[in-house]
Amino acid sequence: MAIEEVIDRAVQLRQTIEIEYCTRSGRVFTCLISDIIYSRYYGGQYILAYRLDIKEERTFKISRIQKVNGHSFSRIFWNQIGDNFNRI
């Protein structure tokens, strides 16, 4: 199952999920999110969700989600960090 399918299922079933997320700067963190919806402002490649650990709503780019509930999704792409491009 692709990550988009897992996210879509979580949106439809209103599930709380644990994600591992890589920020644009390359920092990786894990958090629980709930109340997940697709972002109307940023389009279908982003979700809006409530982070339970910091008790705030946040926007997440779907392609930066590396794991959902412990399941890894391998993606090979180039990510620009600063002035350098790094393979992730």
Give the label of every model feature segment.
Residues 1-88:
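Core beta-strand-centered patch of the WYL/Sm-like small regulatory domain
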